[in-house]
Amino acid sequence: PSPEMKDKVSKYSVLENDYDWSIWKLKMPFDSTPYVMETQFQFNPKAKVFINYRRPVLFCSSPEWIRREKEHINNTQLWSIALLHELYHQYQYSNDAILTYVLRLYDEKKWLDMDSLQVYYLKDNLFKDSIKVENDLLEKAVAATSLDEEKKIYTQFLKVRANRQKDFLKKYKYTLVNIENFWEKLEGTSLMMEKILKENFTKVAPPPYIVEHDEMYAKNFAFNEKEKSEIQFYSELDDKRFYIGTTGYNLVQLLEKNKVAYKENLYKYASLPLDLQLKYFYKIK
């Protein structure tokens, strides 16, 4: 936390750790939400007293609290994956270009969070149907066995997406292009990081103290990313998960499949979309 945040917090204690981190434990909860695992902003000028005013702050409930609210997160390993997903968002926002772009989108009244995007997905049937077609095309492109086939499928994806975004603009008098591109980049790469972390989780030795004293640490627990359900979790749409994360993840899969050097400019050029980098790669006019 930055030094100026201290004036906005009534009481806190500093948690000791083995890393060069400054971790605060608030004496009182920041809000009344029993479960939180999210990087949050406040933009409203009336919220200047909050520590996350125009600044991304990760709010995280303890494993014990989360187990009460989310039955599927029932051990330390699962909790840590959720935490590291959000910590990766913190890393993304630590890049000046990304944070500056977020603030600019808000100031220009072009900002929507992922929850707001998901509302359109859940409530607008035509919007949702198009997203399903788009994601199916992305999955087919990932599975394609030739570059020519892949290019044809991806070209169709771009057409379907462009038509949906045009229809949205006509209907709601608001463009989604920039904000969808932004969230696909951030959430798609976070999900890819999460999946890779699960695949390599056993290579990271847990601290002996955790193994000995943490009652929620599951000693025989292991992730199996080859299970069909795990593969589907990332690549297939589910109303309970952000659609933008799924399409973003599949775009990242295509970039990785073709060894596109997208990581070099991933956060340096905040407004550069994943789908455009693939369009350049396929040389689609």
Where are the regions that the model predicts?
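Extreme N-terminal leader/anchor segments
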Residues: 1-18, 82-88
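Active-site scaffold of zinc-dependent metalloenzymes
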Residues: 10-76
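Mature extracytoplasmic/lumenal regions of exported proteins
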Residues: 76-79, 91, 105
